[in-house]
Amino acid sequence: MANLSTLITIALLLCATMLTCSARPEPAYFASFTTSPADTLSLEMIESKLHEVAGESCDKEDDEDCLVRRTLTAHLDYIYTHKNNHH
């Protein structure tokens, strides 16, 4: 009887393990950490857009879109310059 309960316990643990493994499939696409020419081009386009937006001034106090763009520009500029300084 003890062998039967041990066998059932092991079978239940095995089934539970199989269910958790199948519940979280691996993603089909793994992002590469290498920089491809397309990524470099994309970064250059983003950087040129950042410089374009950075030169813009928010004249109106209620121009929320302008403030959002400038904040985003500042954050992205910090991220890219921080990344470039720590290679």
From Swiss-Prot:
Protein's GO biological process: cell differentiation; cell population proliferation
InterPro entries: Phytosulfokine
Residue(s) carrying Sulfotyrosine: 78, 80
UniProt record similarity statement: Belongs to the phytosulfokine family.
Name of this chain's protein: Putative phytosulfokines 4
Top-rank taxon: Eukaryota
Keywords: Developmental protein, Differentiation, Growth factor, Secreted, Signal, Sulfation
Function: Promotes plant cell differentiation, organogenesis and somatic embryogenesis as well as cell proliferation.
Single Gene Ontology MF annotation: growth factor activity
Presence of the UniProt keyword Signal in the record: yes
PANTHER family on file: PHYTOSULFOKINES 3, PHYTOSULFOKINES 4-RELATED
Propeptide regions on this chain: 24-77, 83-87
Compartments (UniProt record): Secreted
Signal peptide: 1-23
Bilayer-spanning residue ranges: none
